[in-house]
Amino acid sequence: MPSFLRGILKPKERHHENKNHSQVSSDSLTSSYPTSPPKLEKTEAGSMVSSTTQKKTSHHAKPTITTKTEQSQRRPKIIDQVRRVESLGEQVSQKQRHMLDSLINKVYTGPLGEELVQTLYLRIWAMKETPESMKILQMREDIRDQYLRMKTERWLRTLIRGKKTKLRDFQKRYEEVHPYLMMERVEQIIMEEAWKLAAHIVQE
């Protein structure tokens, strides 16, 4: 039984119990409940107990069916919300989504991607050393380039999302992540380069 129905049904159950106790003889009452149920005679009191139990059972079943129906109606909406959150960048307008996918493809395959990883490498090399920067600089070149491309894609999909991303949307998102970027200088550099690449999409 759903937890929110317990508080509603308990007063009714107590009312039926008091009513039943008042209609049975005083000899059948004991100081404690028996381990086995007492045999009921074929009296009006016995028939009243039986009918009351049936009413209780039918009363319990109705809210349960209603609750399951409501949950089944809500379930598709909840699933839709989860799917939207799972993949950043999928909520953009069709035009922005096409431009974003095209840009990410160039980051991985075209000369734009080569220029990007070289710029990121030089900026990370010139910055003050941190554990993250040292880890990147010590990577093998092909692994490092792929790592920087993946980081850039993540920032692109983070910055370009919503029904239609505008400049003020980016500014708001930047303010949200600013404290994190102040502690992670490498992430700040990658985010800045990602923004340079995506600025034309936002300003369209």
Curated annotation (Swiss-Prot):
Residues that span the membrane, as ranges: none
Organism classification: Viruses, Riboviria, Orthornavirae, Negarnaviricota, Haploviricotina
Entry annotated with the keyword Cytoplasm: no
Gene name per UniProt: P/V/C
Pfam families for this protein: Paramyxo_C
Biased composition (Basic and acidic residues): 10-20
Family the entry assigns: Belongs to the respirovirus protein C family.
Lineage top rank: taxon: Viruses
Keywords assigned: Host-virus interaction, Inhibition of host innate immune response by virus, Inhibition of host interferon signaling pathway by virus, Inhibition of host STAT1 by virus, Inhibition of host STAT2 by virus, Interferon antiviral system evasion, Viral immunoevasion
GO BP annotations listed: symbiont-mediated suppression of host innate immune response; symbiont-mediated suppression of host JAK-STAT cascade via inhibition of STAT1 activity; symbiont-mediated suppression of host JAK-STAT cascade via inhibition of STAT2 activity; symbiont-mediated suppression of host type I interferon-mediated signaling pathway
Matches recorded under InterPro entries: Paramyxo_C
UniProt entry tagged with the keyword Methyltransferase: no
Name of the molecule in the record: Protein C
Region of interest: Disordered: 1-78
Low complexity bias locations: 25-34
